[in-house]
């Protein structure tokens, strides 16, 4: 009966001009007809037509086979395991369990306990020697206090590693598994795998650069700082390499997001060019939401580590900048100030790389997709496609692809500008304090010289009276 009424209505519509309300009614009838036809084809509950499937059935062997992200970035994961920074493990092939796991009693974690204990002994010995040397020295000037604080602050990430990194191991494993699942879903939906052709050489290069740069920076401090002993350098190599490794990890993930979004955007453009792409757009919208949630999970998984990372960079940059400027004002430029400027440049470079890469990744996943969807000519597509495009845009608005440190801060270019403004404020205060000390020293020196001259004049006058 319903089919007969629809056919009669369509016959009548051919012979009249439709107003907008009639056209909307016609589209609704056509959509109902398609849904009824689909229900006749299967006996499932109608909820499957509007509710997203909770999980795509997958085989662990297929997950391993198509996990290009893991295979291309495996070297960085192994480096983190060797350094004891993030002891997560990859599940053996064929084992029906999450592909990346985290447990407190795994082999990787036992090794992390051991290597961390050895490194802690070295760091504590060097820290004790630095503290004892500072206490025993007679020079207690404010500048010397600042100078000693710089190299003590660099040790802070080591002591906070268990709290900042290990404690979030389960979230990191979840993030890795999200990448694995996303690649398989992408293959199912688009029919094409995601390929990361540049990540393999980039990851290997960054692994080597992380340790090479650590050696260069610490040895430069040994040669440029007058009281930096060679034995003290061994307490800093692994710390700087760890900071470099986390920066490399962030760069690799942001690059992967950019590569995935570029391939995804191309597939979206091809789908929009087809006839009646509404059903496919629904799957693409769900896939995009997964990609956005992955970016949010990256910030959540490493929130503590990168939060401390940014604080250490902020604090060390301020102290090193002040120390170098105050020494130049008081004593002139020396090799010591060059060493401090090396630290400042290094810290600001790390912050710039992290913020800039996060900005580009968010733009590629969010803004680029919005522009493609907004450029769709809605008058040239059917009503169902129009609604899907609108829902896609709403999904982008409600799930912004931002990298947020678990609610503490958004990682983007705005973080650089805010940090620089805060640094400038604190530096102005510290330099005012320094100039006040210099004025007081000059005033005291002038008074002392004046008193000495007066006493000498009085002694000369007394000698004249006696003669």
UniProtKB/Swiss-Prot annotation:
Answer yes or no on keyword Membrane.
yes
GO MF, one annotated term:
taste receptor activity
Give the positions annotated as glycosylation sites: 453
Q: Tell me the residue ranges located in the Extracellular compartment per UniProt.
A: 128-144, 220-238, 326-337, 436-467
Any Pfam family: 7tm_7
Annotated membrane topology is: Multi-pass membrane protein
Recorded protein name is Gustatory and odorant receptor 22
Query: What is the organism field in this record?
Result: Anopheles gambiae (African malaria mosquito)
The protein's gene is named GPRgr22
């Amino acid at each position: 009966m319903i089919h007969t009424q629809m056919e009669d209505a369509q016959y009548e519509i051919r012979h009249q001009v439709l107003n907008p309300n009639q056209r909307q009614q016609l589209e609704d009838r056509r959509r109902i007809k398609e849904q009824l036809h689909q229900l006749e084809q299967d006996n499932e509950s109608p909820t499957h037509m509007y509710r997203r499937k909770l999980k795509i059935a997958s085989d662990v062997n297929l997950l391993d086979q198509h996990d290009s992200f893991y295979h291309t970035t495996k070297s960085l994961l192994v480096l983190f395991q060797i350094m004891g920074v993030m002891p997560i493990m990859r599940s053996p092939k064929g084992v029906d369990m999450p592909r990346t796991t985290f447990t407190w009693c795994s082999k990787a974690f036992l090794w992390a306990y051991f290597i961390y204990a050895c490194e802690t002994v070295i760091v504590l010995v060097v820290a004790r020697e630095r503290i004892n040397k500072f206490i025993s020295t007679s020079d207690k000037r404010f500048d010397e206090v600042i100078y000693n604080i710089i190299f003590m602050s660099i040790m802070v990430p080591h002591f906070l590693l268990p709290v900042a990194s290990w404690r979030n191991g389960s979230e990191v494993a979840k993030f890795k598994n999200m990448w694995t699942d996303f690649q398989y879903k992408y293959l199912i939906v688009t029919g094409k795998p995601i390929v990361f052709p540049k990540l393999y050489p980039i990851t290997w290069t960054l692994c080597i650069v992380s340790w090479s740069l650590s050696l260069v920076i610490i040895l430069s401090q040994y040669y440029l700082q007058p009281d930096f002993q060679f034995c003290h350098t061994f307490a800093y190599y692994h710390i700087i390499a760890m900071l470099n490794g986390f920066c490399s990890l962030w760069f690799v993930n942001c690059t992967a997001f950019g590569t995935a979004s570029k391939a995804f955007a191309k597939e979206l453009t091809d789908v929009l060019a087809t006839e009646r792409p509404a059903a496919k757009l629904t799957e693409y919208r769900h896939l995009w939401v997964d990609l956005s949630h992955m970016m949010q999970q990256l910030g959540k998984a490493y929130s503590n580590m990168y939060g401390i990372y940014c604080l250490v960079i902020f604090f060390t940059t301020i102290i090193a900048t002040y120390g170098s400027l105050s020494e130049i004002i008081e004593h002139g430029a020396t090799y010591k100030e060059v060493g401090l400027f090396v630290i400042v440049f290094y810290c600001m470079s790390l912050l710039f790389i992290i913020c800039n890469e996060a900005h580009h990744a968010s733009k590629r996943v969010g803004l680029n997709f919005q522009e493609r969807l907004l450029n769709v000519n809605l008058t040239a597509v059917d009503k169902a496609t129009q609604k899907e495009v609108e829902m896609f845009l709403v999904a982008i608005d409600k799930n912004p692809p931002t990298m947020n440190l678990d609610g503490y801060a958004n990682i983007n270019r705005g973080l650089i500008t805010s940090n620089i403004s805060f640094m400038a404020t604190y530096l102005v205060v510290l330099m005012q304090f320094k100039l006040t000390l210099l004025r007081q020293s000059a005033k005291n020196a002038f008074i002392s010289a004046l008193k000495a001259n007066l006493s000498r004049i009085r002694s000369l006058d007394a000698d004249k009276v006696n003669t």
